[in-house]
Regions:
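Short, aromatic- and glycine-rich surface loops/edge beta-strands on solvent-exposed regions
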Residues: 4-10, 249-250, 278-284
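Active-site-adjacent structural segments surrounding the nucleophilic cysteine of cysteine proteases
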Residues: 9-95, 159-165, 221
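Short, surface-exposed beta-strand/loop "edge" segments at domain boundaries and coil↔beta transitions
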Residues: 14-17, 143-147, 177-184, 209-211, ...
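Conserved active-site-adjacent core of cysteine acyl-enzyme catalytic domains
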Residues: 73-75, 79-208
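Low-complexity, Gly/Ser/Thr/Pro-rich intrinsically disordered linker/tail segments
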Residues: 188-245
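Extended low-complexity, serine/threonine- and proline-enriched intrinsically disordered segments
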Residues: 232-265
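Aromatic sugar-binding surface patches on proteins
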Residues: 266-283
């Protein structure tokens, strides 16, 4: 086998806090890669469909990876929002959510065995055979972009079309126009050409593992006639959003539909008032 040695140096400017290493991930790329196709399989897995246009636009197109990671976890019953994943894995140095290592670490914080890997078709087929969807990096053209760009998609299966005697892959493309258009297929020959080899594998969460997923605090709303806005209230105490608040304030109106996950709901952005409250969108 191949051995690897890592050195981690921890430091903090807060003399009252002891720095601690909670999760460590490492990835390597082989110098020589004998790509293999493996044996064709015919299996389709369920993977929730999330698209960029329905979620927080402040992260930009880098939001594709948090969308796919949320889908990978939610298929195992996690019910995490892509925005929660994005805030966990955001690279504070660049403000980007496109770092695959941070994505794997975010899933690890939620209790899921997750790792980056360079995979070929054989590896991907083995993952699908084992019942596990995979995040894959595809080079493709995006509307409005002249040059091909990398897009993270969710691989959810392989199939065969008897009519044309061709194999195909089943993908979830978060850059689609709507949630209903996320599911797509691609011929295996085309997939092999556009797939970069970068992948993120995720396995079901063990029952006995400790997780550190985002904390959710149930609050109520109270209306202020004086300020003409709504405020969050926690146990009767008004909670004001600070001026430097950098999160995403959004509401999800009841639409009478039983959604598979919370992330399937339609969220509408809310306006933060100068007093630290909210205003709902005009249509609400």
């Amino acid at each position: 086998g191949t051995g690897v040695q890592l050195q981690v140096n921890l430091s903090t400017k807060n003399d009252k806090v002891t720095p601690a290493l909670r999760l460590l991930a490492a990835a390597v790329r082989p110098l020589a890669w004998d790509k293999q196709s493996g044996h064709p399989i015919n299996r389709r897995l369920y993977l929730p469909e999330y698209c960029l246009s329905a979620h927080d636009p402040s992260f930009g197109r880098d939001m594709d990876l948090p969308l796919v990671m949320a889908a990978l976890m939610n298929r195992w019953g996690e019910d995490i929002l892509p925005e929660e994943v994005a805030h966990i894995m955001a690279d504070k140095a660049t403000g980007s959510t496109g770092n695959a290592a941070f994505a794997a670490a975010a899933a690890g914080c939620c209790g899921y065995p997750c790792w980056q890997a360079w995979m070929d078709l054989k590896d991907l087929r083995e993952q699908i055979h084992d019942g596990c969807s995979v995040a894959v990096r595809i080079e493709r053209r995006i509307r409005g972009q002249r040059d091909p760009v990398g897009v993270w998609m969710g691989l959810r299966g392989f199939g065969h079309d008897d009519a044309v005697l061709a194999d195909f892959v089943l993908l979830n493309d978060p850059t689609a126009d709507s949630d209903g258009a996320v599911n797509c297929t691609m011929a295996v020959t085309d997939f092999a050409r556009y797939f970069t080899g970068r992948a993120i594998a995720l396995r079901p969460k063990p029952r006995d593992i400790e997780a550190d997923r985002p904390r959710r605090v149930p609050c109520s709303f109270e209306y202020s006639t004086e300020d003409d806005c709504w405020y969050l209230s926690l146990r009767g105490q008004r909670q004001l959003l600070p001026a430097e608040f950098s999160g995403w304030a959004a509401c999800s109106p009841h639409d009478g539909v039983a959604h598979a996950t919370t992330a399937h709901r339609t969220f509408r952005r809310m306006e933060r008032t100068r007093t630290g409250g909210f205003r709902f969108p005009p249509e609400q």
